[in-house]
Amino acid sequence: MKSVFTLSASLAISLLLCCTAQANNHKILGVIAMPRNETNDLALKLPVCRIVKRIQLTADHGDLQLSGAAVYFKAARSASQSLNIPSEIKEGQTTDWININSDNDNKRCVSKITFSGHTVNSSDMATLKIIGDD
């Protein structure tokens, strides 16, 4: 009876350690300052090409309005993918996950992400934080 209890306790502890040891793969890819006037050439270049399966956008400071976004992959043909993003993000808000690499080609790595948009309702520049998940 004692050995059954010991075995059960050991399994429970190992399960807890197993689950707490797993780290999420969310990484802050970068932050972009959004100008007050509409701009279509805001780019976040990743210094190290990395596989990113989805991203989240957060308005860290100020409200912002987005009119487009695209992901560029390191490939022989400079492949890219347009992203379906919300048109407005309020300060402190985070979007749902936005999937990229939709063709299931997980070998492609992201070299840059571009945005079109601007700050709204503020005299200061809003900041857009990009979080990636691999």
Swiss-Prot record:
Q: Which residues form a coiled coil?
A: none
Keywords, ordered alphabetically: Signal
Q: Keyword Signal: yes or no?
A: yes
Q: Which residues form the signal peptide?
A: 1-23
Q: Quick check: keyword Signal in the entry?
A: yes
- Pfam families for the chain: DUF2541
This protein's source sits in the domain of life called Bacteria
What family does this chain come from, according to its entry?
Belongs to the UPF0412 family.
Please identify the protein, giving its name as recorded. Answer: UPF0412 protein YaaI
What organism is listed for this UniProt entry?
Escherichia coli O7:K1 (strain IAI39 / ExPEC)
Designated gene of the protein: yaaI
